[in-house]
Amino acid sequence: MKMMVVFLFSILLVFGFVAFASKPSPVYGGLSLVVSGGLGCAIVVSLEDVFLGLIVFLIYLGGMLVVFGYTAAMATEEYPESWVGNTVALSMLLFTVIVESAWYLMSGEVKVSMDIELFDIIGGYCVGQDYSGVSLLYGCGGWALVLLGWILFITIYVVLEVVRGCN
């Protein structure tokens, strides 16, 4: 059941990136990136790495909030173009269906294998990778967390100054 969920999230992730690549309007492009980021983190969480999925989701959405605010402010349209009349998205959907059908016909089955080790043996104790990631993030990786937070702060400040200068 878990692999079916991962497979479904993966297909939706590809459709989210196709929706971004067809980019009918910057507002919809930012929305599709946020949805794709959420689906990517859902894949990580469904593979039992909850902390990594949460951290990536928060950091990614922090960056996407900046980008989404910038694109929405700089390219405001009264009637934004939608995905309905876009030939890029429809041709990508057709290409995806053809590739998936060819893969199924050539292999005879759709099989997804996964070899992920969930536990590390450290000193005779079983320590989950999820919990060791927490200690590494706040231990040796604390400088990276502070640096990323500072970069996001500077970026939002620059975006707000650019948007303020346009009026």
Curated annotation (Swiss-Prot):
Enzyme Commission designation: 7.1.1.2
Any Gene Ontology CC annotation: mitochondrial inner membrane
Catalytic reaction annotation: a ubiquinone + NADH + 5 H(+)(in) = a ubiquinol + NAD(+) + 4 H(+)(out)
Complex and partners: Core subunit of respiratory chain NADH dehydrogenase (Complex I) which is composed of 45 different subunits.
Keyword Nucleotide-binding: no
Source organism (scientific name): Osphranter robustus (Wallaroo)
GO molecular function terms listed in the Swiss-Prot or TrEMBL record: NADH dehydrogenase (ubiquinone) activity
Protein name per the record: NADH-ubiquinone oxidoreductase chain 6
Keyword Electron transport found: yes
Sequence intervals crossing the membrane: 1-21, 27-47, 50-70, 88-108, 143-163
Main EC class the enzyme belongs to: translocase
Regions annotated as coiled coil: none
Family affiliation: Belongs to the complex I subunit 6 family.
GO terms for biological process, alphabetical: mitochondrial electron transport, NADH to ubiquinone; mitochondrial respiratory chain complex I assembly
PANTHER family reported in the protein's UniProt record: NADH UBIQUINONE OXIDOREDUCTASE SUBUNIT ND6, NADH-UBIQUINONE OXIDOREDUCTASE CHAIN 6
Localization (cell): Mitochondrion inner membrane
Its membrane topology: Multi-pass membrane protein
UniProt keyword list: Electron transport, Membrane, Mitochondrion, Mitochondrion inner membrane, NAD, Respiratory chain, Translocase, Transmembrane, Transmembrane helix, Transport, Ubiquinone
